[in-house]
């Protein structure tokens, strides 16, 4: 319905919608999905594209910050991953996720929609369907897309306070959760995760949100025992990301 032009950001949205529709069809037929595009046509394991971490295919991008002018339509990874994150949120599933993307395509996307405009369209569709719009904004925010329709900026993350651990954290494979803290005193600080089950990865970056390709500290160890020691600069805001290498639960995050 939208007539998305098959180049630039609109081309990425166009390609993503095809992938998303395919996953929705798989969900309709089988009752579950593998989050892999084209797995059935591969004799061995793997597929053409991956929803949880699009860059696994060697061409797609995971985050809008990796987009550049002239990139091919494998920038579809941005919207594919947003769809994956949304469909895996509590109260959502593949069908509900596809519904909001489909309505956005029918009513709100235009031939040259940018990522932000496309995300805004999905939020408007969720509002039309009486679905949780905050979940949609959060999913797009994780992949670097401002889906707030130019009104309220997306959340920058929950505040992490020194000596006040946050317990019982959980997340899905490929899911991302963000926190921030601002340094008020000189000296070193330690950000750490511990406990629980599964495997969460810790990322820290000064001044902006870390991604899987841009960070100041990333221990990247098996399990949930990770820490980043930082020679903190007074007045600097640090961004912390917890990313699920696999599903995890019961994890504690602390700043010391």
Swiss-Prot record:
Enzyme Commission no: 3.4.24.-
The record's GO CC annotations read: extracellular region
- Spell out the molecular function terms from Gene Ontology: metalloendopeptidase activity
InterPro entries, per database record: Peptidase_C_arc/bac (IPR007280), Peptidase_M4 (IPR023612), Peptidase_M4/M1_CTD_sf (IPR027268), Peptidase_M4_C_domain (IPR001570), Zinc_Metalloprotease_M4 (IPR050728)
Quick one: a GO biological-process term for this protein? proteolysis
Location in the cell: Secreted
Instruction: Give a yes or no for keyword Calcium in this entry.
Output: yes
Record note on cofactor: Binds 1 zinc ion.
Q: Does the keyword Cell membrane apply?
A: no
Cofactor(s) demanded: Zn(2+)
Entry function: May play a role in ulcer formation. Proteolytic digestion of gastric mucus has been suggested as an important mechanism by which its pathogenicity is at least partly exerted.
The text of the family note is: Belongs to the peptidase M4 family.
Instruction: Output this protein's name.
Output: Zinc metalloprotease
Q: Which gene encodes it?
A: hap
């Amino acid at each position: 319905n939208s007539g998305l032009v098959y180049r630039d950001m609109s081309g990425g949205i166009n390609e993503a919608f095809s992938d998303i529709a395919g996953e929705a069809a798989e969900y309709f037929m089988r009752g579950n999905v593998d989050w892999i595009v084209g797995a059935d046509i591969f004799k061995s394991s793997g597929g053409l594209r991956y929803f949880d971490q699009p860059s696994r295919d060697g061409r797609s991008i995971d985050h809008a910050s990796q987009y550049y002018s002239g990139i091919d339509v494998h920038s579809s990874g941005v919207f594919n991953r947003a769809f994956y994150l949304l469909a895996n949120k509590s109260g959502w599933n593949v069908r509900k996720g596809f519904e909001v993307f489909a309505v956005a395509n029918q009513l709100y996307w235009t031939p040259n929609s940018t990522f932000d405009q496309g995300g805004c369209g999905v939020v408007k569709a969720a509002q039309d369907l009486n679905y949780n719009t905050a979940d949609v904004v959060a999913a797009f925010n994780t992949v670097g897309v401002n889906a707030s329709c130019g009104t309220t900026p997306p959340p920058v993350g929950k505040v992490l306070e020194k000596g006040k651990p946050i317990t019982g954290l959980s997340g899905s494979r490929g899911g991302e959760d963000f926190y921030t803290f601002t340094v008020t005193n000189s000296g070193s600080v330690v950000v750490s995760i511990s406990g629980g089950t599964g495997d969460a990865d810790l990322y820290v970056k000064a001044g902006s949100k870390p991604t899987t390709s841009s960070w100041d500290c990333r221990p990247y160890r098996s399990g949930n025992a990770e820490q980043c020691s930082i020679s903190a600069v007074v007045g600097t805001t640090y961004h912390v990301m917890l990313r699920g290498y696999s599903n995890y639960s019961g994890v504690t995050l602390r700043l010391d």
